Each structure stands twice: as C-alpha cells, then as structure tokens.
Amino acid sequence: MVSFKSLLVLCCAALGAFATPVGSEDLAAREASLLERSTPSSTGWSNGYYYSFWTDGGGDVTYTNGAGGSYTVQWSNVGNFVGGKGWNPGSTRTINYGGSFNPSGNGYLAVYGWTQNPLIEYYIVESYGTYNPGSGGQHRGTVYSDGATYDIYTATRYNAPSIEGTATFEQFWSVRQSKRTGGTVTTANHFNAWAALGMRLGTHNYQIVATEGYQSSGSASITVY
C-alpha cells in the first residue's frame, strides 16, 4: 500500500508540474488528500481501548478511532483488511457491542483475536456479507450462546500473515447462524466449547471487535463496551 500510494502521489505531482504551476502548499495539500484515502497498518491504544488495524494495501480503506470504544471504517475495492477496538491481552470476558455493519460483498463482523503457544487466530462471527467464512473450514460442531446457535469450524492457514510474522497456524471459528450487529458475546461459552472439541487456545494476545473486508466494499461503525 505504501509503495502504491507513494507512486500515485509522485505521478500526480508530476502531472501537476507539467499542467500548471503549483505552489508548494497546494502540492502538499494534494499529496495529503491522496494519502488520506487509506489508513496504514497500526496498533496502539485509543481512549482506554486497544486497537489493531491491518491492511494488505489493496484498494482504499479508512479506519478511524472514535471516542471510548468506538471506531468507523469505510472501504472500497479492498484486498484484505481487519481492524477494530478491544483489549490486550484478551481473556474470557463478556463483550458488549453495537453499531452498523454494511458490507457489499465479503466481510465479517466478529470478536477477533490471537493466542500464542500455540499460535491461534480465532473468530466469533456475529455477521457477515455474501460469504460464510466457515464454509472453507472443517465443521466441528455447534454451541448455543447469547440467544443463538453458532457453528464451529477449524481451518489451517499456510505461510500467512500473523502476529509472529509469516507463519502456518490454526484458525478457530464460531459463526452465528442468525446474523446481528449488536449484543452480548460471552466468550467463555465459545472457548469452553472449543476446548471440549480439542481446540486449545494458548496465551491470549489482543482481542477486538473487528470489521474485516476481503475483495469488497462497505462501511461499519462499531462501539465496544
């Protein structure tokens, strides 16, 4: 993304130089406008909540931290991104959230996190767009939690991005059968159900309520409590 955007800025600057004289302030404003179209990958703390935002650099995606546990994200023709707010480290906490989630194509709204030793990427999916993310994995069972049934899946990612760099690791999924964009997620119910199926988490790293987009467009505005 950085190299693409930098190239785009340089091209626009060159075109401007050939077309009409441009002052340094005008050129700087033009470059800033172009660069603001996408948010670079970053992690940190915002208003008492941990946030994580990652993008592969494809398309345009703007992630913005708001007050408290809120954030917004807008994306257009992206490759892949995932971002949101929550906690670091994660735990078997009860999570409350609300807002709007409007994907056009493939996107997920989920409690999302990582553990280490073993390295596990996990999702508790509350809503999704045109593609059920569990359909590419192995169905392991179901769990009833917070008023609905979730299907449980596992999958393996090979040589994929992770919190430890490029790695091969397991994914654990709980996918809610009835989609929603607000409510309570009792993570202990999912973690216990996974453990009963031999799906063991490691030591918790971060845990967020995330929006993810894959080769799609859309918008979301989410608040974590």
From Swiss-Prot:
Reaction it catalyzes: Endohydrolysis of (1->4)-beta-D-xylosidic linkages in xylans
Applications (biotechnology): An increase in fruity aroma was organoleptically detected in the wine produced by the recombinant wine yeast strain T73 expressing xnlA.
GO biological process: xylan catabolic process
Signal peptide: 1-19
List of catalytic residues: 121 (nucleophile), 212 (proton donor)
Primary location recorded for the protein, binned into one broad class: secreted
Domain GH11: 37-225
Cellular localisation: Secreted
MF GO annotations: endo-1,4-beta-xylanase activity
Pathway membership, UniProt: Glycan degradation; xylan degradation
Protein's UniProt keywords contain Secreted: yes
Recorded effect of pH on activity: Optimum pH is 5.4.
EC number of this enzyme: 3.2.1.8
Family: Belongs to the glycosyl hydrolase 11 (cellulase G) family.
The name this protein goes by in its record: Endo-1,4-beta-xylanase A
